[in-house]
A protein has these predicted regions:
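Extracytoplasmic "Venus flytrap"
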Residues: 35-53, 79-86, 90, 190-199, ...
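Short, polar/charged alpha-helical segment
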Residues: 45-67, 203-209
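Segments of small-molecule ligand-sensing domains
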Residues: 323-337, 348-412, 417
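Beta-alpha junction/loop-to-helix N-cap segments that form part of ligand/metal-binding clefts
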Residues: 29-31, 44-50, 65-148, 160, ...
């Protein structure tokens, strides 16, 4: 009886050890769980998730991440926070993140909340659990302020995409270039009545256009309700007042009507700003053309566009298209996807340099990041925001494209990577 019991226990032990062994006899390493949390039902969230999964597949094909003397595979767990959907409370998004951290034991959260309100609230959750979070969508500069005020609590949070301050700097830089290049002085502002547009346009007017040294005079400012389809009154007013440039800021699908009406009415003023709809290579075909001359901002290089000056932007696009098919997917905005892609590489490098999964040690290595990536040079400032500028050898970059009447898009800003000059609409002369 005792002999039989001993044999049974021995066989159970052998079976247990066998479960832990891989095919080559090595102990199977426990995977590192990478959590992807955002509004994954939207195109931007979905594409960001796809980009990260592509990197995870690549890393796992090489055996995983090297942690000290061992290799650890990666496992992706996802949660759709739905925080970009109307009526979804921030508390629901936080609950989803907490389930990922506690239930799925996520080591790090990538992409992160879509809305700035959800991001700021989630930082306390990240601090509580000491989980790394590398952001690539939400843009509020208040993230950096929180890190500056309480570094020890919030040091686990980093952002790779541009923030709203960077956004305004690019708009100001573009208009400074336009003013210098064409000797223009008169601008008219057209924006939708959304939180995004108000948060961007009001500081831009107050802190740039209305400053004497900007060289610009604001001839008028029209705010249209969300969902508006007729923008003719604002366009006619801009024409009547002699505006030489139209700053447009929209993020809703109806914004395409503003650009098309500008074109069909033959308004003799440059159309330059942000819609998010006119940036992809497929936009001309999908939207029926009719917006040649319009300029739009792509918030980070690599989001559907690449240049030889930034080799990894072309490499990323090539890999993405081979893996998932033509860009874009699901109407994604030109924002966040390339930063999400780079976030997984940055996390991998930091873990391998630290030689441990201790979050404090990995934070120190992320802070030292200095790599050439899909957006240009990637470095973090002291408050964990990636540095953006106009020279990809020194910083990550956003780009402004202008559509030509033959349906081709051309990078016109910043000058360091421009592929053509800004073309003026018919009837608009320089320096008038």
């Amino acid at each position: 009886m005792k002999k039989g019991l001993f044999i049974s226990i021995f066989m159970l032990a052998v079976t247990y050890v066998g479960v832990l062994l891989t095919g080559n006899g090595a102990i199977a390493a426990e995977p590192i769980v990478i959590g992807i949390a955002s509004s994954l039902g939207l195109g931007t969230g979905q594409q960001s998730m796809d980009a990260i999964k592509m990197v995870v597949e690549e890393i796992n094909s090489r055996g995983g991440i090297t942690v000290g003397s061992s290799k650890r595979p990666l496992k992706v767990e996802t949660v759709d926070l739905r925080d970009a959907e109307p009526g979804v409370p921030v508390t629901e998004a936080l609950l989803g993140m907490e389930k990922l951290i506690i239930g799925k034991k996520a080591y790090a959260i990538l992409v992160g909340p879509y809305r700035s309100e959800a991001l700021l609230a989630s930082m306390d959750l990240i601090a509580k659990h000491k989980v790394l979070m590398l952001l690539s969508i939400a843009m509020t500069p208040e993230m950096e302020n929180k890190i500056q005020k309480d570094y020890e609590s919030y040091k686990y949070v980093f952002r790779l995409c541009i923030n709203s301050k960077n956004f305004m700097e690019y708009m100001a830089g573009l208009y400074t270039y336009i003013g210098s290049e064409f000797k223009f002085k008169r601008v008219y502002v057209l924006n939708e009545d959304s939180g995004f547009s108000r948060a961007a346009v009001n500081p831009l007017i107050a802190n740039y256009f209305e400053k004497p040294d900007s060289g610009w005079t604001v001839m008028g400012h029209r705010t249209f309700p969300i969902g508006a389809t007729d923008y003719t009154t604002g366009l006619m007013d801009a024409q009547m007042k002699g505006a030489q440039a139209l700053l447009m800021l929209t993020s809703m699908p109806q914004g395409i009507n503003l650009v098309k009406q500008w074109k069909s009415m033959k308004i003799s003023a440059l159309m330059a700003g942000y819609t998010g709809l006119l940036t992809t290579e497929e936009a001309w075909k999908e939207l029926g053309g009719g917006f040649g001359g319009a300029m739009d901002l792509i918030m980070e290089m690599g989001n559907g566009i690449g240049v030889k000056e930034i080799p990894r932007s072309l490499e990323f696009l090539d890999k993405y298209v081979k893996r998932y098919g033509p860009w874009p997917k699901g109407g994604a905005m030109p924002h966040g996807i390339a930063p999400a892609y780079e976030s997984m590489y940055i996390l991998q490098e930091a873990i391998e340099k630290a030689g441990t999964l201790d979050p404090d040690a990995v934070v120190k290595e992320i802070e030292k990041t200095d790599r050439m990536g899909a957006m240009g040079r990637i470095r973090f400032d002291k408050n964990h925001q990636v540095v953006y500028g106009v020279d990809p050898q020194k910083a990550s970059v956003a780009v402004v494209i202008q559509w030509r009447d033959d349906g081709q898009r051309v990078i016109v800003f910043p000058e360091s990577i421009a592929k053509g000059k800004i073309e003026l609409p018919a009837g608009l002369k320089t320096g008038r």
